[in-house]
A protein has these predicted regions:
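ATP-binding N-lobe of GHMP and related small-molecule kinases
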Residues: 1-84, 98, 102, 106-108
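Short amphipathic alpha-helical segments, especially helix-boundary/capping motifs
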Residues: 3-6, 32-37, 72-76, 91, ...
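Glycine/small-residue-rich loop that forms an oxyanion/phosphate-binding "nest" at active or ligand-binding sites
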Residues: 78-129
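Generic, ordered loop/turn and secondary-structure boundary motif
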Residues: 18-25, 48, 81-83, 87, ...
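FAD-binding core of FAD-dependent oxidoreductases
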Residues: 6, 10-12, 16-23, 86-93, ...
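Conserved active-site and cofactor/substrate-binding residues in soluble primary-metabolism enzymes
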Residues: 15, 25, 48-56, 87-91, ...
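ATP-dependent small-molecule kinase catalytic core of the GHMP/sugar-kinase superfamily
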Residues: 109-199
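N-proximal short alpha-helices
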Residues: 3, 86, 101, 146, ...
Length: 199
């Protein structure tokens, strides 16, 4: 049996829209084991099948490495609320890939893990800090693998999580993001982003 723990993340920090995220101290815990049939527990029944994001990521990783898919049991226990802006999907993606590596004995580098997770998730801003920890500025040059710059977060800072009593999916949240911001707002944000590392 393999146990994997992945931290929640908060992304789109300040001026770092779609690029800057950080790991936070809420966690999702996953166990993986080979099985006779696919079994998924610890999540709503509608996700206890092949459409489960953990399993989809597991299968994608196997395909990336030229491995055949095999039945697996997956148990999920999470502190990370779904669709509340804390990277719940990223925890699933990262765990699925790591579970595939562990059960097949495949050695995966952090760079490879970020690249596969980004391909599944669509962008690296949540998966990169979930893998690397701390704060990460990440971007993907056209036709290239994701690049990540990791920064330690000041220990002087304390974070508060405010979780709304309703779900907000990323696709819906993006619809209300303004396409332009005033220069003064951008300057204000840039001037304060260093506080993340310096406190």
């Amino acid at each position: 049996m393999i146990r994997i723990t992945v931290p929640a993340t908060s992304a789109n920090l300040g001026i770092g829209y779609d690029t800057l995220g950080m790991a936070v101290s809420l966690y999702s815990h996953f166990t993986f084991d080979r099985a006779e049939t696919l079994t998924i527990t610890g999540c709503p029944e509608q996700f206890q099948n092949e459409d489960n994001l953990v399993y989809e990521s597991f299968v994608n990783a196997l395909a990336e490495w030229g491995e055949k898919t095999f039945p697996v049991s997956i148990d999920i226990s999470t502190e990370v609320p779904v669709a509340r802006g804390l990277g719940s999907s990223s925890t699933c993606v990262v765990a699925g890939i790591m579970g595939a590596a562990a059960l097949t004995g495949h050695t995966v580098t952090r760079e490879e893990l970020v690249a596969i997770a980004t391909a599944v998730e669509g962008h690296p801003d949540n998966v990169a800090p979930a893998i690397l920890g701390a704060a990460v500025c990440s971007f993907t040059p056209e036709g290239e693998l994701p690049r990540c710059l990791r920064y330690e977060v000041s220990k002087r800072l304390r974070f508060i999580t405010i979780i709304p009593p309703y779900e907000v999916h990323t696709s819906d949240a993006r619809k209300v993001v303004p396409q332009e911001v005033p220069l003064s707002t951008a300057v204000w944000q840039m001037g304060r982003i260093a506080g993340l590392t310096r406190g």
